């Protein structure tokens, strides 16, 4: 490709509305342009990267035995009503009616459509297992699209769905998809972790997220510094303290704390160690409970894990925090003065809280706290559960090493769905025993457009993008200095351009009448891994300057050797 016949569209300045580095660089490098909120046009440079990501995904899915299909973006509402997700999904599901007043949706996922296909096409266990995939545009009406293509409303996704007659068969395919995803992200040159995850609104049993490590990530992921253990922070188990609870050394005293409505204020005003404080959070109880609320207690420096809390049998789902009015109706005190002593509703404490002694907590009286509280002396030990987020330095749940916490960008997610959708849509086949058998499902997604942004978040410097070789828009940039004035520069540039293309190498030759500084800046901005600079001065010695984008290292290579050098560097 020649720049004179190409839409390069680079920008010198960073657009003001671009928050994260990937959004900034995708705009500056001429990869995307915003059409409307959460909607982007992919320009040639961006599309080349997107297609490379897509091709790697397709190759590995085919290698894993998945079968490609293509399903409509527009889906009839009756399928969503049949599955129950018409009511569950929320405003992200874009709903509309056609001219015949029939309701439809723009598909954010395709569980209903593929299950409908399978229930009509398959009849016998002998046809299974099968794993279908597609790479297709999805639409989710995000309330606040942000970070460019990282959280857009329209995006390209690879979604796959497998069907089985046994859990063992599902596990085999799940393991194959796990391995395929690991190969996909490894081939792309990404630093990622596969982490245990919550199944969320999709539902189902086992689940793993594939997270690209990046400071701009929206998810906290935890992993052992020794073993392979890794999990989303929502799912990571906080191990109970291994040391016995210390003996009481203080008497419980009632203290006036009129200006301490938060843990931070309590610690500051009374010079308390924060690890000697307990915070109390009130949430809605399950229906038919004797009490409308449940009290959840965590240590002052810990955070409640809402996913864990929601799974408690005493707690209503979805997790709902009590309002101040609801709290006062039951406790007769405000949210800044709550604690376990004389608490009239069920109490659940975190494992760490159960190991505390001589601690401070609200007295369930406005403007007052108890100091020196001890379990089984001042208040009976309530129900104990793991309800907090882990913190860095906690012991790893697998017993090996301690936990590290980093930010991650979710680029892939695999689920063992079980029979959630097949039961709702009555998808069954005749089993080996001749009886109808409900199918067991798995689903496996990769955010193809998000992968592009995530790769940039891991691969950039002050000059621009530093693409991993496998997904770079071009492999080689040829920069001929003053080619419109120097015949020998132009002749060699054309010769190398043809020879490299003949070797199957993707080349961008900058044949614009631009200053060298502009040419260098543009090629570094769009992140082409290998650059060769052809100039009269070096040609006097039969040399060409070669530069590797990632390391910045430069070297002089003889003109007769440069093609072989690049072929070896790119193809190995």
From Swiss-Prot:
A GO molecular-function descriptor = proline-tRNA ligase activity
Question: What subcellular compartments does it reside in?
Answer: Cytoplasm
The record's listing under InterPro entries reads: aa-tRNA-synt_IIb (IPR002314), aa-tRNA-synth_II (IPR006195), aa-tRNA-synth_II/BPL/LPL (IPR045864), Anticodon-bd (IPR004154), Anticodon-bd_dom_sf (IPR036621), Pro-tRNA-ligase_IIa (IPR002316), Pro-tRNA-synth_IIa_bac-type (IPR004500), Pro-tRNA-Synthase_IIa_type1 (IPR023717)
Write down the top EC class of this protein: ligase
Query: What is one GO cellular-component annotation here?
Result: cytosol
* UniProt keyword annotations, A-Z: Aminoacyl-tRNA synthetase, ATP-binding, Cytoplasm, Ligase, Nucleotide-binding, Protein biosynthesis
Gene Ontology BP, a term? prolyl-tRNA aminoacylation
Which SUPFAM superfamilies does the entry link to?
Answer: Class II aaRS ABD-related, Class II aaRS and biotin synthetases, YbaK/ProRS associated domain
Q: Could you say which EC number(s) this protein's record lists? A: 6.1.1.15
Catalytic activities: tRNA(Pro) + L-proline + ATP = L-prolyl-tRNA(Pro) + AMP + diphosphate
Q: Which family does it belong to?
A: Belongs to the class-II aminoacyl-tRNA synthetase family. ProS type 1 subfamily.
What this chain does, per the record? Catalyzes the attachment of proline to tRNA(Pro) in a two-step reaction: proline is first activated by ATP to form Pro-AMP and then transferred to the acceptor end of tRNA(Pro). As ProRS can inadvertently accommodate and process non-cognate amino acids such as alanine and cysteine, to avoid such errors it has two additional distinct editing activities against alanine. One activity is designated as 'pretransfer' editing and involves the tRNA(Pro)-independent hydrolysis of activated Ala-AMP.
What is the annotated quaternary arrangement, including any partners? Homodimer.
Q: What is known of its domains?
A: Consists of three domains: the N-terminal catalytic domain, the editing domain and the C-terminal anticodon-binding domain.
In Swiss-Prot or TrEMBL terms, this protein is called: Proline--tRNA ligase
